[in-house]
């Protein structure tokens, strides 16, 4: 059993390798097996024809590093631990594994996917539905902030897959609206984030209600001790798929910084950028909800059309704003880290960090929004004297060099 950590403590990715080495160097080294087979194309993976149609229709051409390694073992029914960040195509990895194994003639819940936020759960639901379009999959997202009665009605009518947040999923199981008898796959997405948000007990409670023989997939950017503990309690001889941090991170995304003497001058720099660049769609990250509102007002007063979203807005408003952004009717979205993980817009070509993130891990969650799945993307970081330390930490953490923004930036977009 991995040592459990103090409640509410946070761990970063740098501890992952050390922790794994320590665990694998002990008598428990039989616990994990590494899975090293790599498939260069989706066609080579032995997937159903109609699943392949969904994958290609969604816009995938070549599998990403995590997909090349991760789809097949999941399809084989193995318990899988994948260390993978946002922007690497991991959602499509486990969605493909789930869709390949469903019995479509049985309209009962056969797969349960848990995610830490409503936005992420809804995003997974969209990907699952899109990839399973030609298979006739029935998917439902059970998340807080929506009608309990509506959830009960849909679950009663029958679905193949439920995606949701731990609180609402546990509620549906407790009310017996979600029947666990046929569930054969259980996926924890962003396990580190769920644990840091205090969902550990609920995840354990849900697991107790599931059938004993069940396939488990754990996806996590980092592996804090609590996540390792979960893998030990829930999993049976899991295969461990690790894509090295520098291999999966920022491939295909050009990163730059702009030196700004004072915090107050960031706004001028930002407006200059928007006046010189032809941008399809972009996301601007700031660190506080208050700053989202402030920056939105400032940009609108200068005739820039922008949308804004943050955690203080109700779910319905956030959904409408995200729909507008996805459809392209709004081209600039200002937001905070909280929602970084739920944004998946294929056309985003530019991410601007108006504020650098407070944790190096979040840098990837943010800039992974541009250059999704091998597309070209650009990230621009606005840096004052106070930000220099964090910029240095980010470069060290991801083993990258972030260069000063060149004069010909327009040619890069």
Swiss-Prot record:
A motif (Q motif) lies at residues 40-68. ATP binds at residues 84-91. Its EC number is 3.6.4.13. Keywords: ATP-binding, Helicase, Hydrolase, Initiation factor, Nucleotide-binding, Protein biosynthesis, RNA-binding. Residues 252-413 form the Helicase C-terminal domain. Residues 71-241 form the Helicase ATP-binding domain. One of its GO terms (molecular function) is RNA binding. A motif (DEAD box) lies at residues 189-192. It is an enzyme of class 3 (hydrolase). Pfam families: DEAD (PF00270), Helicase_C (PF00271). It catalyses: ATP + H2O = ADP + phosphate + H(+). Gene3D superfamilies: P-loop containing nucleotide triphosphate hydrolases (3.40.50.300). ATP-dependent RNA helicase which is a subunit of the eIF4F complex involved in cap recognition and is required for mRNA binding to ribosome. In the current model of translation initiation, eIF4A unwinds RNA secondary structures in the 5'-UTR of mRNAs which is necessary to allow efficient binding of the small ribosomal subunit, and subsequent scanning for the initiator codon. eIF4F is a multi-subunit complex, the composition of which varies with external and internal environmental conditions. It is composed of at least EIF4A, EIF4E and EIF4G. Belongs to the DEAD box helicase family. eIF4A subfamily. This is Eukaryotic initiation factor 4A-2. It comes from Nicotiana plumbaginifolia (Leadwort-leaved tobacco). The lineage of its organism: Eukaryota, Viridiplantae, Streptophyta, Embryophyta, Tracheophyta.
């Amino acid at each position: 059993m991995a040592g459990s950590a103090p409640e509410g403590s946070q761990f970063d990715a740098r501890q992952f390798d050390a922790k794994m080495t320590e665990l694998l160097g002990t008598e428990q080294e039989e616990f994990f097996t590494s899975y090293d087979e790599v498939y260069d194309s989706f066609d080579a993976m032995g997937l159903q024809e109609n699943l392949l149609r969904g994958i290609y229709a969604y816009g995938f051409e070549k599998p990403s590093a995590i997909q090349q390694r991760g789809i097949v073992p999941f399809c084989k029914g193995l318990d899988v631990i994948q260390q993978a960040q946002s922007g690497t195509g991991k959602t499509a990895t486990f969605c493909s594994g789930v869709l390949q194994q469903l019995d479509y003639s049985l309209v009962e819940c056969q797969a349960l996917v848990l995610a830490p936020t409503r936005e992420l759960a809804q995003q997974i639901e969209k990907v699952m539905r899109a990839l399973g379009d030609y298979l006739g999959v029935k998917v439902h997202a059970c998340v807080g902030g929506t009608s309990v009665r509506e959830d009960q009605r849909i679950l009663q009518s029958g679905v193949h897959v439920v995606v949701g947040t731990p609180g609402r999923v546990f509620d549906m199981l407790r009310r017996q609206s979600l029947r666990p008898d046929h569930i054969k796959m259980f996926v924890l997405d962003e396990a580190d984030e769920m644990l840091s948000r205090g969902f550990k007990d609920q995840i354990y409670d849900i697991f107790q209600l599931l059938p004993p023989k069940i396939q488990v997939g754990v996806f996590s950017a980092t592996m804090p001790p609590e996540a390792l503990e979960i893998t030990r309690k829930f999993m049976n001889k899991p295969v461990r798929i690790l894509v090295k941090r520098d291999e999966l991170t920022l491939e295909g995304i050009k990163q730059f910084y702009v030196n700004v003497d004072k915090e107050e001058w960031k706004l001028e720099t930002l407006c200059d950028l928007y006046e010189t660049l032809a941008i399809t769609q972009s996301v601007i990250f700031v660190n506080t909800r208050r700053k989202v509102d402030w920056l939105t007002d400032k940009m609108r007063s200068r005739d820039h059309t922008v949308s804004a979203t943050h955690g203080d807005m109700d779910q319905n408003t956030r959904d409408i704003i995200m729909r507008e952004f996805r459809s392209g009717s709004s081209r600039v979205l200002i937001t905070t880290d909280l929602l970084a993980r739920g944004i998946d817009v294929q056309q985003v070509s530019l991410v601007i960090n108006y504020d650098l993130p407070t944790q190096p891990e979040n840098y990837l969650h943010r800039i992974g929004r541009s250059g999704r799945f091998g597309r070209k993307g650009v990230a621009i970081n606005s840096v004052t004297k106070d930000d220099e330390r964090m910029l240095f930490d980010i470069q060290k953490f991801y083993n990258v060099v972030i260069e000063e923004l060149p004069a010909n930036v327009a040619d890069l977009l």
